[in-house]
Regions:
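Glycine/threonine-rich beta-strand-loop-alpha-helix active-site module
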Residues: 73-131
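ATP/NTP phosphate-donor binding region
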Residues: 1-89
Length: 131
């Protein structure tokens, strides 16, 4: 029986009411000038992505194909967009699924590996860019 767990966390996770008021500062603190926003079609259709874009002082590309259970195909499409765009910062808007998609897409780009080879414990070979 397992008796311990390890938790790996981002240096900064910002969420909650009023987070949009801080988003510009959060992105600028990590040096974000070219931002890739990863979200889903619902949040995009609600205008949330537009509000974030207006709040940022950066060049922005949007990947709005997030899914409830992100597939490795969605990760590969997102990574392809990221490689072509070359963001210095990635911003996930939404819940855990969009954050998972963003993390795996960033790991795919930084490692140069196929997303299917990154699934499992300790498979990501190193740090990824600001997320």
């Amino acid at each position: 029986m397992r008796t311990f767990w390890s938790s790996y966390a981002s240096p900064r996770l910002t969420f909650g009411p009023g987070v949009l008021n801080e988003i510009r500062n959060v992105v600028s603190q990590v040096g974000g000038c070219r931002v890739l926003i990863i979200t889903d079609p619902i949040l995009e259709s609600l205008g949330i992505v537009d509000r974030v874009k207006q709040a940022l002082d950066a060049e922005i590309e949007v990947f709005a194909e997030g899914e409830a259970e992100p597939s490795t195909k969605a990760v590969a499409r997102c990574a392809e967009i990221a490689r072509a765009y070359g963001p210095d910062t990635t911003l996930a808007i939404g819940g855990g699924s969009n954050m998972d998609l963003a993390k795996l897409a960033c790991a795919t780009v930084s490692s140069g590996r196929d997303p299917e080879t990154l699934l499992g414990f300790d498979e990501v070979p190193g740090p990824i860019g600001p997320l």
